[in-house]
Swiss-Prot record:
Its main location: secreted. It comes from Chilobrachys guangxiensis (Chinese earth tiger tarantula). It is found in: Secreted. Disulfide bonds join C49-C63, C56-C68, C62-C76. This is U21-theraphotoxin-Cg1b.
Amino acid sequence: MKVSVLITLAVLGVMFLLTSAEERGSDQMDSPAWLKSMERIFQSEERECRWLFGGCEKDSDCCEHLGCRRAKPSWCGWDFTFGK
C-alpha cells in the first residue's frame, strides 16, 4: 500500500514537471541564456578558505575555527574554538 502511494506521488510529480515545462515553451528551454545560467550554477566557486571537510595543506587554508587535520587525506576539521 505504501509503495503504491509513493509511486503515484512520484508519477504525479514527474507529470507536473513535464506540463510546466511545456507551458513555458521549448524555445525558452533551448535558449543559450538558459544554458549559461545553468552552467553558472554548477561551476565550482573559488573561496578564500576551505569549509568543513574540505581539503587542505596547512591550517591557514581552512576557514575560521577550523584546522587542517593531517590524516590521509588532509581535511579541515573543527579546532574546538568558539567565536562570533
